[in-house]
Amino acid sequence: MRTPSRAFAGAAALIAAALVLTMGPGSVAAPGQDSDPGGPGPFPGDPVEVKDKDSRTGRAAPTAQQRARADEVGARARWNAYGTPAMLVSTGDPLATGLSDDPVAAAEAYVAANRDLLGLTARGAAALEVVTVAPIGDGAAVLLRQNFGGLAAGRDGLLAVGVRDGAVWHVSSSLARDAGQPAAATLSADEAAQIAVADAGVDETAVQGVELVAVPVPQRDARAAYEVVLIGNDESQPVGFTTYVDARDGSVLVREDLVDYSEDNPAWEVFPNTPPVDYSSTDTRVRWCFLPGPGCQEVVGTPASPLAWDVNSTNLKPSETTLGNNAFAVHNWFSNDPFTVGKELATPRPNREYDYAWTNQWLRERCSPAVFESALRNDIDAARANLFAMHNRMHDWSYHLGFTEVTFNLQDSNFDRGGKQNDPEQGNAQAGGVTGGPPTFAARDNANQITPPDGHPPITNMYLWQPIAGSFYAPCVDGDFDMSVIAHEYGHAITNRMVAGPRDGLSSPQGMSESWSDLLAIEYLAEHGYAPSGSRAFTIGEYVTSDPDAGIRNYNMSASPLNYSHIDYDFVGLQVHASGEVWSATNFDIRQALIGRYGAGNAALQKSCANGETPVTSCPGNRRWAQLMFDSYLLMAVSQVSMVDSRDALLAADMIRFGGANQDLLWNAFAKRGLGEGAASNGHTDPNPTPSFASPHANEAAVTFAPVDEAGQPVAGAQLFVGPYQARARAVADTAAATALGTTVQVVPGTYELLATAPGRGHVRIGPIALGAGSAVTLTVPMPTNLASSAAGATASGDGINLVRIVDDNEATNWASLGSPIAGKQVTVNLAGDNAHRVGRVQVSAMLRPPVTGDPDPGTQGRVSALRQFRVLACAATPANDCADAADFSLVYTSPADAFPSVAPRPRAPELIIRGFDIPDTRATHLRLEVVTNQCTGAPEYAGEQDADPRANTDCSTASAQARNVRVAEFQAFAVQ
């Protein structure tokens, strides 16, 4: 087993104003490919091209009357582009009372009485029809949709009303003000389909369905449009869209990307979680039976599936293979196109004993492509059976939490219970097994879920994993056997169907969709008793990555330092996987707090709740949290939501289901992660939202930031951050006269790690420090001069490009040497001042950054190009020696070989951020930072031939162009104190 990284293990911490900061376990992120031609990808966490498009322009402002009405009812309002409420959030009291106990009648009465607040004309209000009514405990979420002269709204036009006992607690909408009949279509459905095909860059075989709908447009009448569902044929990346084509002028109004980047009693042999994570070939599968019977280790049938999993709903007979009402599983070895669905089901078993052989062949034969032609066929039957069983289990578990026919779930037959049918989960096992891999590594090291609108069958692709030079060092394993990955991908289907109704899907770079999928996966495993103990219970992808700590993420959510000031923290930029980790950490805290209030129960109670046998009001805290998550999905009628929107929906779900019993707990947990009552986001794409650490249910501590220099004098221009990141993070206090931020910040009680920075002062870590309720704390932070700072007068010379950026006190920029051997590459810093200094400490950052157009180093920065080991040399200039020659410098320090540690599958942000190193007391006017290795050339886990695939070499130093690139963000130097 590979050893998980610890971000500060084995390295001296930075200058500390209080206790030395020990950071939580490090973790995964994504491989960069800045100069490797034809490289693979994207892998989990990589930047992915945004393919959504909305060509509708204009924005209607809410009227003064609307704003006044919102204030009158005590609602916190956010407005959409139509000038109607995107969110009306209760601030304590209901938004309306005295309504009918019938949810639909209450919602309709609310609309009728609040047209002035909602901004609707009489015709706009009358055009609403009920889409679904989803129970939330004793309340419900009522989803209404506008009709425009007989045409249902295809995109937007939705209103979600959360009601309980005749009171409205939450409103979300994408309503148009009016609902007049659009001008009649002049294009045919076929013409619209051709336009959508051309716009998406796919062929005509991609068209899955065409329907005439209405699409509202801000400040204009709604347009008749054709909704065209496309499933494409691009082998390099999944391509699928719902495209709305104007039915009169042929323009593409909206294009939405559908892809998210993970006998009578039948029995299945399955891995409930994963095969052994020591990668032995011990078969630890258990026998699941649909009904009780001899030899069954677990009974899995529940009322969520009226038919046994392998019964064909068209003839009510057993399929005797991996096909049933909820899902089917096939192999798709011969196509890298994620939108194709294989044809070959598992080998039939007339006795319905799906106990196929598993030999661990892909791992034992080290990713050899010869496995596909062997008698064992790479354990494909076992893979199909495992994937099929896991999809059925997710169907049943989520059904008991509210993902049912009326909330647009995945079933071939809906048994006349509502919703559209003919859409079971289509599972491709070992997708692209034969055609994928080297040289492009298509169909490797990933998984995806494609979720079209209700009534169109979704597709999920599970891939094989293998090491890829300079990119992603996975073990040779099959993703069909890692339930955290399978459940994660199924989670995308859940949220894309439940949030914003059956058509709109879910789109936000702030990453809640990725986070929700992670959270659903860990909760499923926990409730069923399949999760490992300790922090590994919160790892996504341990088996497919060999990292028991963080898996495919940057952090294990149970030990994450992230908060809402860190949305853009990762060097891939604002990206759903990394940004979503903020939401995961927040929800982990909420889950733990609810367990603290309601207990964890025992294994029997957890399983009973998971199977829907025990009502949630009698379940442990974690099940209550899971239920609130599902309830919150139904309260969001907008697909493009921010974390603040999602926070408000979760708070409203608690008001509706539990009568607000947990508002204090929820608010305090949100505030601890920067999503407190003052948090704000400028839309769903805001990379720099406003954090708030204040709660309406807490007596906050007041922290006053007071940085001082060596003489005890105040430091101007300093910034204070909550957590370990400066680059692309948002400060919570500062001493800059030109900003409105101020020196004091209110924070809920708790323990915090902080970071201070200032021009000419470098980085100072603070804490952990405990802040008590109601305390007033003056945080005096010593900030000595960074002798290697350009702001203090230092200058840099040497190899490479962007030399000034290694001495700018800013981890958001970096120096690079590109395209030549890296060992010995150096930057020499002429230290601040005219005299020699006694230097006893340096601080170095290997942090990378997103692409910057026009920069000398403009592109994506490969992860393994980050510095790993370095040396420090010194020179003290004299009248006879100006430190101009290499011979003038003496070696004073060699860092540990893993100064910036990373392990498989790849480097990630926590391992690369700034850290401190004590060096011998050195008299110097000049210091030289010299590269020994980067991550590619120096990390043992990226070295050597790691598989038996003859088509590619896995050794990073010889097979990746990143071996010739190296980057450093900061070099800082401090005098002996």
Residue ranges and their predicted role:
Residues 810-887, 908-977:
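Aromatic, loop-rich ligand-recognition surfaces of beta-strand-rich domains
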Residues 759-784, 939:
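Structured interaction patches on ligand/partner-binding surfaces of diverse proteins
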Residues 702-710, 781:
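A short, amphipathic beta-strand motif
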Residues 709-733:
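Short, ordered, surface-exposed loop/turn motifs in non-cytosolic proteins
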Residues 748-760:
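A short, solvent-exposed beta-strand micro-motif common in secreted/extracellular proteins
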Residues 2-30:
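Secretory targeting and sorting signals
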